[in-house]
Amino acid sequence: MYKRSLKHPITALLIAILACGFAMVMNTQMMLGEKVQEIEDGFLTSTPGERSIYSRLSEKLDASNGLWTILESEDAAAAEELSVSRSALLTAYESRDIAAMYDANAELDKAFASAKAAAEAAELDESQASALSSYVTNYEGASKMIEQSSYNSSVLEFMRSVYNKFPASRLADFAGVE
């Protein structure tokens, strides 16, 4: 009985459909997953002539830590807000979670601007004022380089030309490619 059911045309059709579906999902995972990984590598890895966004985030973490050291004796509330936002980015940074880094970076930008305003309003001595200027310059420079990174255009191009087009958009969701 078992041998006869495998020879039945409907059984053969179902097996063929399942095999094709499985092959399509595996191909999508491999091809799109490979391209997504390549783009993510551009976020994490510096290339000749351009440092990665990941390394620029490290600069922002360093600059925000420096600002925190100035601010902690001047405005505890602003220092705490900066510390919380910095910790969130540091956690995302250490886990290498790009989406979480994006969100935490936006929050750190707000907290840094607020902390900068609080530090500028405080009466700083000459060395603190010089350090503040250096931290702000480093932070803003890193932010500008992140905005101008070629990674951003490569993500946009990939999303427009591949990921958001049918059938890749449907298959990626189905295959679990993020």
Where are the model-predicted features located?
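A helix-centric hydrophobic-segment signal that preferentially recognizes long
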Residues: 2-178
